[in-house]
Amino acid sequence: MNATRVLCVENHPEYMGALKYMLDAAGYEVMAATTGGQGLRLLTDLHIDGVLLEYDLPDATGSAVRAEMKRIKPDIPVLLFAGIGSQTPFLLRFFDSYLRNSERPEVVFDDLDT
C-alpha cells in the first residue's frame, strides 16, 4: 500500500519543518514547495493526493494557486494553511478545509484521506 502523498506549499521554513515532521510521522509522504509556482509544477508532474497551501506566498495568493490547482486536478483536496483571522469566512469559501498554523496537522488527516 502506498502512502498518501501530500503537497505542502509553505514559504516559512519553521512551519514547513513542523508540517513535514508531523505528516511523515503519521505515514504521509510529503512533497515540499516554497512558492505557488513550484507547487503547481509538482502538482502537474507528480501524483499528489492532497495539498496543504499557505495563503501568503511570495509569488501569488493562496486563492490564485488553489484556483489553478483545481483547474489542473478538480477533485484534489486543497486545505488552507495560514494564520486565520477576520478573513476566515471569505477565504474558506475557496478551500476544502483549513489548518491554523498554531494547530497540529492531525486535525486535517480525515480531509487529506478522503
Label the predicted regions.
Residues 10:
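Conserved acidic carboxylate
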Residues 13-31:
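Two-component/phosphorelay signaling modules centered on CheY-like receiver
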Residues 41, 63-75:
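Short amphipathic alpha-helix used as the core "switch/output" element in two-component signaling
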Residues 48, 62, 90-104:
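As written
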